[in-house]
């Protein structure tokens, strides 16, 4: 897959997009895919070599919350509100509006304690909702949106970021059709 770096460094775009860091993750962890000497370009927020590494960092952080961190009340982090309170603390963000927006993306209440962040579809929707919230509407910046929730990146880039975080897209299987004279004839020679 080619690196998705189309927006890297473009100062007219949101910081998360131009840094290939659509979750606006701050410097701290030694993430895979960091730009060497990136702190010289942005002292606060990570710069990734491509967007899939930035997406990987979002997913890896959320999995860590789910597996190893606790909500404010000491329980497991398993609701949208608990994830967002950790991701975007209220001292810097309107966490209620953020959680409500993500709830609409996932089509569940922000307080429903049913999230499984090891589930590909759940994580994908959560990551795309975060990208959309953190980076805004691409049309505001004259960028043609992609036909998905985040609108900034094509599906392949999201899939690659999630794959790098250890989440693979489920494979759709088709039920086997029993062989009969009719079905065998449709595919070629029949042995009777």
Language model features with spans:
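Cell-wall polysaccharide-cleaving catalytic domain and substrate-binding groove, primarily
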Residues: 1-191
């Amino acid at each position: 897959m080619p690196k998705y770096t189309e927006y890297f460094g473009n100062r007219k775009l949101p910081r998360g997009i131009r840094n290939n860091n659509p979750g606006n993750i701050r410097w701290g962890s030694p993430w895979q895919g960091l730009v060497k000497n990136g702190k010289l370009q942005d002292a606060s927020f990570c710069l990734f070599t491509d967007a899939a590494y930035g997406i990987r960092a979002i997913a890896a952080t959320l999995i860590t919350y789910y597996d190893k961190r606790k909500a404010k009340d000491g329980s497991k982090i398993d609701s949208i509100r608990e994830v967002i309170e950790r991701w975007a603390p209220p001292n810097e963000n309107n966490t209620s509006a953020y959680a409500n927006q993500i709830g609409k993306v996932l089509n569940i209440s922000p307080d429903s304690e049913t999230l499984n962040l090891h589930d590909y579809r759940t994580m994908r929707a959560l990551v795309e909702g975060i990208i959309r919230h953190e980076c805004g509407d691409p049309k505001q910046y004259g960028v043609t949106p992609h036909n998905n929730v985040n609108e900034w990146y094509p599906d392949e880039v999201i899939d690659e970021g999630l794959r790098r975080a250890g989440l693979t897209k489920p494979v759709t299987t088709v039920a086997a059709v029993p062989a009969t004279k009719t079905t065998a004839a449709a595919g070629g020679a029949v042995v009777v």
